[in-house]
A protein has these predicted regions:
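Beta-rich carbohydrate-recognition and catalytic domains
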Residues: 1-152
Length: 152
């Protein structure tokens, strides 16, 4: 069904968050069923790995979504990197019910993994408010960079 563009049958694939290591590519992504449309059931990050972008190994949901009462009812985009201690994911948690209750609907979150496949979420939301000029309802999709010179 797919070549180069990974798409499981019957699923909308969105927000690809790639990570590569030693010729292996981790293709983290969102799977939206669009059921009911246009914004379907809550989702986490799914994972497929590949070495050639033709053949894939599908792991299904790798970073699990939260409950309907948690900040990460949906797990929106983010980024993955690796340190000596393992993998880190910084991502956006979104809850579509929070705005109605007067809560912040999007928050930055963190998870760790030993293998890049199974993730453990940190318990605390990150206290990183949007800078002046950014929409507080659309503060999301963190991307982490390593500064070689400063080693941070």
């Amino acid at each position: 069904m797919y070549q180069l563009y990974y798409q499981p049958e019957g699923i909308w694939v969105g927000d690809i968050m790639p990570y590569g290591k030693e010729g292996q590519f981790y293709v983290y992504h969102q799977r939206d069923t669009r059921n009911p449309g246009p914004f379907g059931e809550p989702f986490g990050w799914a994972l497929a790995t590949t070495k050639d972008f033709v053949d894939y190994k599908d792991y299904g949901e790798s970073l699990m979504r939260g409950t309907d009462e948690e900040a990460d009812q949906f797990i929106y985009a983010g980024s993955v990197f690796e340190t000596e201690a393992g993998f880190h994911a910084f991502y956006t948690g979104y809850n579509r019910e929070f705005l109605k209750a007067g809560k912040t609907s999007q928050t930055l979150l963190h998870a760790t993994s030993k293998d890049g496949i199974t993730w453990e979420k940190s318990k605390e939301a990150l206290e990183i408010p949007p800078q002046e000029g950014y929409d507080k309802r659309n503060w999301r999709d963190p991307f982490v960079l390593w500064d070689e010179e400063r080693e941070e």
